[in-house]
Amino acid sequence: MYLQSLQKLCLIALLLPGLSWAGQVYVSNEKDDTVSVIDLDSLEVVDTWLVGDRPRGIILSKDQKYLYICASESDTIQILDRATGQIVGELPSGEDPEQFILHPNGDWLYAANEDDALLTVIDIPGRKVITQIDVGLEPEGVGISPDGNTLIVTSETSNMAHWIDTRTNENIHNSLVDARPRDAKFTADGKQLWVSAEIGGTVSVFDANSREEIKKIHFSPKGVHADKVQPVGIRLTENGKYAFVALGPSNHVAIVDQQTLEVLDYLLVGRRVWQITMTPDEKMLFTTNGVSGDVSVIDVDRLKVIKSIKVGRFPWGVAIADE
Amino acid sequence: MLACSMSLLLSFFVNANSQINELKVGVLVQSPEIPSAVPDYLKPNEGEGLAGALQAAKDSNRTGKFLGLGINLNMAQLDDQQALISQAKEWMADGVQILLVDADTQALLALRKALPEELILINTGNREDSLRTETCLANTLHTAASFSMQTDALAQWLRSRRLSEVMLVKGDSESDKKYAEAVKASLKKFGHKLVAEKSWSFDTDLRRVAGKELQAFTQGPEYDLVWVADTRNLFGQLLPYNTFLPRPVVGTHGLEAGEWSQVIEAWGAVQMQNRFFKDNQRPMTARDYNAWIAIRALSEAMTKTRSTQGAELLAAMLHPGFYIAGYKGRKLSFRPWSGQLRQPVPLFNQQALVATAPFEGFLHPRNEMDTLGADRRESRCTLASQE
């Protein structure tokens, strides 16, 4: 009797995936104007939600109730209720928002406006723009230090990482990196900043205090022409062990030792891999593969690709909720 | 203490920004001679090339302001060779060190001869191969792709599609002849067969009778495709769908090969296309792109050297480690022997990007992009000594 009702419950949960509170992976599909919902247990697409035009950056709210989605061509950031899959509001984003990041306080959002060479600072509870900061051409990747005091925005055509003090919203430093910087990430201890350069083919690691470059990491997966090695998304494990770097059209993800800054291995994933996100327990890594239209799942303990999941056209961003 | 060091840093950057070290660049465009028989919709846009340079200066100065570097443009479009020379001299007297030139071969040679060698030229429009192989110009770079880069790109595509028997149809202008020579060399280089060669020199109004006339004209032996050499748009646009055998048309019309087209959207290009359209109310053309990439290369060299000295910038651009990002998905660089910009060559029609050369399988010991156009051993030029 008990078993039966449990089965029924499971059935209901399967039929109403939007209501299930198991862990879920959300993938924005740039050319389909949708978000694919993947169940973290079954690793299958359980739902597809229609969102604004050209969805790219996608992140979770601090309480994990909402998804914020950069609908680039709708010139807005949409707020989506995870429980219902419905758009419940919008945030003013400036024109053509591409990537963004949440301040650790959960209230401030920093969005790069690619077409306007601006960084927009948004107050989420008030749903208003706090300020816009002048940055280099085609701002793209945004990263924030764990203490929330330092924000980094990379500009793709100016080849710079701009350092911004979030307490004053002033640009305090500019570091030149290789061509077309795409992503910026601080290590969990806040001591290092990693910046990927897509056309340069490198990742620059900076000392976050002195703002000096410590090392430039180069990549050479076997059998791939150097020009096709185009680093984009970076993920650093919180335990300080690994860094994962998506290498674009080389169709590989590099595994880097966070301590020695040496490349350990390369994993073959889908075609043109751009963004990567890890589950909060750091056991699984999801990559978006734009050209093959799928997501590769990597088992972090075994460092193996365990599955690829078909999603929409041109998957771009990925966010993961563990409950 | 913290606040103090912060304000020091801030003032440092304010200082750096307020003193902009400027590089003066001239942009010279020779007004193209357009026969009246060319339909209006195929005539070049007003200010083509100049608009690209302007866009790049805007783009570059946004980066430059963080470094205290800037590019200052002087621009002119003139008809006459003599007027081009005197304009260049006037600018030089005013401190211009770099000159972008889009002109025919005669005018380009005359300019190089009339101006001192320390003035660096960047050719943004002339495709003639001899300027990269025989007539080597001092301190001159080329961002315009040569005819042979265009024809090699198409010849590689023919290989990838297993098409090899070619009927060549050429116009009678000087540049049509130069283009046709490049076609023949590419056919040989990539093992294709020229089965027929025809010259179009008629001056009838084709508009109502294109089907009849061109079908009759393209009769001959069996062919896989028609390759058209009509650099002036006098008849080539009427060839696709009007060939005697229903075969593809490639070359100056049909499937084209060039540096740029509005159909290119990948590799982040859509951002620049949008930026350009917003400012100019028209799409960016290849001549705009060639000027754009020339200024971007200068800007990149300025960032690398923190210098605004022409000679230092030229050396930096020819340095083996130098590269620029040009929305083409690969690093672009200059061939040290001829000063030619190495670049992927997109193949496109009016509505879509079809493919991008170099194609997989065409290998090169140094750089696959050097399978397009004159390689080192095919050129007598030695612009830079180091590789």
Where are the regions that the model predicts?
Chain B
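Bacterial N-terminal signal peptides
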Residues: 2-11
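Extracytosolic ligand-binding ectodomains
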Residues: 16-387
